[in-house]
Amino acid sequence: MKNELEFAKKLIDFIYDSPSPFHSVDNIKNTLIENGFAEIKEENKWELNKNGKYFVKRNDSALIAFTVGSGFVAKKGFKIIGGHTDSPTFRIKPNPEMVSENSYIKLNTEVYGGPILSTWFDRPLSIAGRVTVRGKSALFPETKLLNIKRPILVIPNLAIHMNRDVNSGFKINPQVDTLPIIGIINDKFEKENYLMKIIASELGEDIENIIDFDLFLYEYDKGCIMGINNEFISSSRLDDMEMVHAGLNALVNAKCSEATNVLACFDNEEIGSATKQGADSQFLSDILERIVLSFGGDREDFFRALHNSFMISSDSAHAVHPNKGEKADPITRPHINEGPVIKISAAQKYTSDSNSIAVYEEVCRLSGVPYQKFVNRSDERGGSTIGPITATHTAIRTVDIGTPLLAMHSIRELCGTLDHMYVEKSFEEFYNL
């Protein structure tokens, strides 16, 4: 249990230091550099080496890392693990300051993804993301990371005495009910550029140099290990940072194989992936083709490589809920700490089929990791993942898997300490094949 707890603590630290997709990618980048990976850029000509370790960023919120295999890539292909860096939250709108009751100052926000809104009330919140400032060229402004590392916001509940329906299905209006308060002002003129002044102070920038921002709310409190036997991890953003963390650790710990090992961390999965940095873009296929071209291959070699490749699409899965067991399939019922979950859908919301399932089952068998399966109830629609999207773009055989989770899309999700270690172990075995 000691190893599992140590690894779980590292996950909690990783998530706490990754309050936005931009910070997630920055932390991934730092870990990769510490382990001998070199950054390459899409705008440059690539000169890659066999057994070399590289990574590419896009939009500062998505990243693809890879270790070049020793074999001919057209024959040996790619072994890919994919996840995403974003989580449900609230994005801060432009000119967000709003004054209420001539006293409170609130921020105007927009829902990002599908959070369980009620879980965001009455919690210490903060702000993190990316700020764009003037650069040397109008075409190429500079960007800076911002993380206000203290609790500065709260979304207060309405007292039950004024909202008697709060415990019986109260409908939350995100334009009214979930706007966070940031403080109290004494003068209406204090409202002007209130947030911009905070940003400028945090970054040490002149306010005139700040052009725009991509800023989001996050829960300030750190995750923890809990349960009478330390069997649970409770944290924000387990979906999908736990899978990214497992994939990252597997990539840096794996031996160099004949195939090229790839870790793809996409942004914007929670809003459909249809962005230049999302899974529904050419990001992955562009990088894979450029790897082939860098070693003298042509487009036919690229298609051959795709045919000889395999991908694990890794996104959190649903565990059976202890209080709502009837919401799960009557037969297929994943439990926390009983291993990673293979996700299956007749409608191909998950891209797993018998061939790709067999591959991952063998990976688990070779690594000594238990596994489970998940299907939705036949009267529940369920969600989807990056798996069907990337498979559509690349035609790579793909399996959808994930760590079983409770309270998915809550501000505070719950998974198992054993499961996180299980997933990493299976990923490392996959990369070592």
Curated annotation (Swiss-Prot):
EC code: 3.4.11.-
Record's keyword annotation contains Transmembrane: no
Cited InterPro entries: M18_aminopeptidase_2, Peptidase_M18, Peptidase_M18_dom2
Cofactor(s), by name: Zn(2+)
Keyword Metal-binding in record: yes
Keywords: Aminopeptidase, Hydrolase, Metal-binding, Metalloprotease, Protease, Zinc
Family matches, as CDD domains: M18_DAP
Cellular component per GO, a single term: cytoplasm
GO terms classed as biological process: proteolysis
UniProt binding sites for Zn(2+): 84, 161, 409
SS bonds (residue pairs): none
One of the record's GO molecular function terms: zinc ion binding
PANTHER family registered for this protein in UniProt: ASPARTYL AMINOPEPTIDASE
Family named by the database record: Belongs to the peptidase M18 family.
UniProt-recorded name of the protein: Probable M18 family aminopeptidase 2
Organism this protein belongs to: Clostridium acetobutylicum (strain ATCC 824 / DSM 792 / JCM 1419 / IAM 19013 / LMG 5710 / NBRC 13948 / NRRL B-527 / VKM B-1787 / 2291 / W)
Species lineage: Bacteria, Bacillati, Bacillota, Clostridia, Eubacteriales
